[in-house]
Amino acid sequence: MPWGVTITNGRLRAVTRAASVLLALACAALLTQPALAANPPVSVTATARATVVAPLTLVWVQDLKFGRIVPRPQPGTVTVDQNTGACTVTGPILEVGKCQYARFAGMGTKNLSARITLISLTDLTGPGQTMVLDQIMLGTNSTISFVGNTNANGSGVGLTKGGNAERFTIITNSGIYLLNIGGRLNVNANQAAGVYNGSITITVQYQ
């Protein structure tokens, strides 16, 4: 056979033998690796937690009182301050006796917030013409802290419109809170003598 052909065949045989050796080494390396299916599973956990708080309660403590009013031929107003319980009179009418704000007391959980819904006005009825109680507002005290927007009366707290709701946070360690309410009574001209009564509705719920 020609010399060149013999050299070519020799090279082919050498390359074939080298490839066989590399293939054998690769197979041996694969056999020494642990099977992927044998790896252990990985697990993690999360904590499930729930906090149960005391339900909100609210009870009546005292009524809103405007004292004794002496009417005149012209109308006037008597306003009970929601923070102090003091009375302010406008017009020719006279007011005698002690005024007081309405007070409610409740219990909840410290640092939780609640929303208050308070009516804006109500009627006082009696033997004469109905008197309107308006500007019903919530006062400040040391058991609660108001959050959210301020209102239009300049005090920064309270409610000036029915349907609006103010939020407060209970800040006492015991969870006891107080809500004081004042308002303005519109006395008609020559209001008939007698006792006049109305009602104020307030609602609180956790937020």
Residue positions per predicted region:
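Serine/threonine-rich, low-complexity intrinsically disordered segments
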Residues: 8-10, 18, 34, 152, ...
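N-terminal small/polar-rich segments of proteins
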Residues: 37-127, 167-207
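N-terminal secretory signal peptides that target proteins for export/translocation
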Residues: 1-15
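Acidic, glycine-rich flexible loop segments
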Residues: 140-185
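Sec/Tat signal peptide C-region and signal peptidase I cleavage site
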Residues: 31-37
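Short, surface-exposed beta-strand/strand-loop-strand elements in extracellular ectodomains
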Residues: 132-141
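Bacterial N-terminal signal peptides
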Residues: 18-30
